[in-house]
Amino acid sequence: MERKYAWHNYDDATMEKVYALSDTYRQFLDNGKTERECVVQAVEFAEAKGYVNLKDIIKSNTPIKAGDKIYYTHMDKSIALFNIGTDDIELGMNILGAHIDSPRIDVKQNPQYEDSNLLFWDTHYYGGIKKYHWVAMPLAIHGVVVKTDGTRININIGDNENDPVFCITDLLPHLGQEQMQKNAAKVIEGEALDLLIGSRPVKDEEKEGVTKFINNLLEKEYGFVERDLLSAELEIVPAGKARDMGFDRSMVMAYGQDDRVCAYTSLVAMLEVDNVKRTTCCLLVDKEEIGSVGATGMQSRFFENAVAEVLTLMGKPNSVSVRRTLENSRMLSSDVSAGYDPLYTSAFEKKNASYLGMGVVFNKFTGSRGKSGSNDANAEYMGFIRRVMESNNVTYQTAELGKVDLGGGGTIAYIMALYGMNVIDCGVAVLSMHAPWEVTSKADIYEAKQCYVAFLNAADESI
């Protein structure tokens, strides 16, 4: 089946828009290396477009009506935005849903130890990483430290050009013969992913002198002591900015593009769509990389609760209205797909793979080995999606996640489908997914945004 190359469709004016969107996208990535940082930006962007905090509306008991724009944050790690349409909300919403957590390495609660005059922080990796990717490269520390009096200290060390960086060391090849005999899953063990944070001792201190020096420095410069790490969330991420990639600058290379490339384009699309007939919604959520668990993951009830609050203030304070609204909704689960890599052909079935530069990707299903754990979108919904995309000149492709018995993956799609709504995965093809630095095509980023705008505006279309 013939595929369209998105780049061929652009005139000079559109090409400028393609590159301009990626410029602002790179800024979003640089300022959002954690889920908390992404939520801060989302709130800033939303308020600039006239969105109001739902919590303030609840306090004032102000009725919600068509034309109102609302956002709701949950524990500073997830956010939902609503643009209330003129149609009865019980007829359903058009929902975009992406995740803003990414694979990384987290600092343990009791992490600090000194060995051979070197001070380390012990860690526990988060999400599906290849552990050997993370050694011998500059790393930054982002997150929060919360003291017993409730004071929250925001931490961002390693991404300013004047900041120090950190690293996880590796064994030199001259002594690495035994290490090199291990398989890739074992060549770097999880317990060996310890972050080197200092080596200078306090003068005239022979025992744990480095520990004392660093502890003094942390208290003086950052305002917390070692014991405060018990109530900290510190994330170790690659140090450095998102960059244009290729002689033609046609790609973006950056950390966290799974799934912030879809989060950003979903957010931009949501804020671009103004007066709507059918209520629109954008969800940016946490914890997808570890199964969407916990209070800030999609398996929690925070989104359902937010919808219930909105409906109550619209004069529909009953569970039936909530159920009707959710069941009648349509969703694009905005998540990335595995881009075909000609260096690793054995992992893909070429007819059903996604390709860089060929537009936004629809995954009718994900899951693994027999579609296990999958949301399998209905053919009727896929037909509706095709109609919306083609009537809006969006370049799109369809794909599966690799060969049938090789592996697979999942998204938040199956969770939202529990409400009975139509859901399909839709996002951007990525090379080197889950590596510290991932690669996307600027054409695909642009087509994703165009796709999301078209979907949000699809009010009169029936399935």
Predicted regions: what they are:
Residues 1-463:
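N-terminal hydrophobic/helix-forming segments and targeting peptides
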